[in-house]
A protein has these predicted regions:
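Non-transmembrane, aqueous-exposed alpha-helical and coiled segments at domain scale
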Residues: 1-375
């Protein structure tokens, strides 16, 4: 047997763990692409549902295909009564990612993927249902209201905002949600996506793969950076206060979320897009604190550490300006990244071999067993 090659690098940094045709991350001249399209162009000109179709079905849809896809998703939004009853049993202080994980897993019990030929339909079902899973639990546990899980909003972003706020969202807010969902849709072999592919490599069902991904995204080193960023930004009352506070955090070597990236070395292309929309929302509401504070932290981090904001940092203020509770920031990520997760599951299934790496042993040398009476 040939000796296995030992790969160094904490967290498998820099290691190629497989092939994908779905996205490129950090390549020179095109920081992030989905099936060859620059994410900045998609965010400027496409609907999220077009991007979902691109990732899941391989090409951008025609107008007729997009209309049919929107119709399909619209009919799949309502939740089974049994799932609503499960969501009503989850307490208000539960972690919202636990809610998403449970909702996904339970839906897989009552609407299972019986054959891989159903993978697209089951993904579309989850894509349509996730906003309602999040909002039904949140509105019931926090307000005691059993909401209607169906709305007349055409888009997933608009539908989510309608369910959350119980009113028709503004065109600006729908547009911003659309952009946000596009920016978070896919990102190559990140931790949650790789978890989904490992699960898929065992030929497990789609719901198990997505549940594994949600559980992985739940960890604070992967998901939750925008929530942590919001909590930090909210501490400061002015740009001057933010600069002083950030310098203090750096001196104490505190973890400052929302900056730097494992792959991007110069900038995160998603940041420039969402920052511009955060500024538009700040202007809309007449904000004179949150966005200036964010910019002050941004500037200080670059001056002191040459660290740039990633996609999560300005998403914090963006979501806040739209009235989205901080605890729901990461579940929104789930509603978007589902498209990337599922596309990777499809890709893994199409050319599968079970993912089973080796480990470099660092324990004691082989030794003789000692009977218990002699120990």
């Amino acid at each position: 047997m040939a000796e296995a090659k030992v790969l160094s690098g904490a967290g498998l940094r820099g290691q190629v763990a497989g092939q994908t045709a779905l996205s490129t991350v950090g390549q020179s001249g095109a920081g992030l692409t989905y099936r060859g399209y620059d994410v900045r162009e998609l965010a400027a000109d496409a609907q999220f549902e077009e991007v979902a179709y691109l990732l899941l079905y391989g090409e951008l849809p025609t107008q007729a295909q997009l209309d049919a896809y929107l119709d399909k998703l619209g009919k799949l939004r309502d939740l089974p009564q049994a799932l609503k009853e499960v969501l009503e049993r989850i307490p208000a202080d539960a972690h919202p990612m636990d809610v998403m994980r449970t909702g996904c897993s339970f839906l897989g019990n009552i609407e299972p993927e019986n054959d891989f030929s159903e993978q697209h339909d089951k993904t579309d079902r989850l894509l349509a249902a996730f906003p309602a899973i999040m909002c039904y639990w949140y509105r019931f546990s926090h307000e005691g209201k059993r909401i209607d899980c169906v709305s007349d909003e055409r888009t997933i972003g608009g539908h989510f905002l309608h369910l959350l706020h119980d009113k028709k969202p503004s065109e600006l807010h729908v547009k911003v949600m659309n952009v946000s969902l596009i920016l978070y849709a896919e990102h190559e072999f990140n931790a949650s996506t790789f978890a989904a592919r490992v699960c898929a490599s065992t030929l497990s069902d789609l719901f198990s793969c997505v549940t594994a991904a949600i559980g992985t995204l739940r960890g604070p080193l992967h998901g939750g950076a925008n929530e942590a960023a919001m909590e930090m930004i909210a501490r400061f009352s002015s740009p001057e206060d933010a600069i002083k506070g950030t310098l203090g955090m750096l001196e104490r070597k505190d973890k400052i979320m929302g900056f730097g990236h494992a792959i991007y070395k110069e900038n995160d292309p998603r940041n420039e897009v969402i920052k511009a929309w955060s500024k538009k929302l700040a202007d809309e509401v007449g904000d004179t604190v949150l966005f200036p504070v964010s910019e002050a932290i941004d500037k200080t981090m670059w001056e002191q550490k040459k660290l740039f904001p990633n996609a999560d940092f300005y998403h914090a203020s963006t979501y806040h300006f739209m009235g989205i509770p901080t605890k729901l920031f990461t579940p929104i990520f789930v509603c978007s990244r589902l498209t990337g997760w599922a596309a990777h599951v499809f890709e893994q299934r199409a050319n599968n071999r079970i993912i089973r790496p080796s480990a470099e042993y660092t324990g004691v040398e082989q030794r003789k067993f000692v009977p218990i009476e002699q120990r």
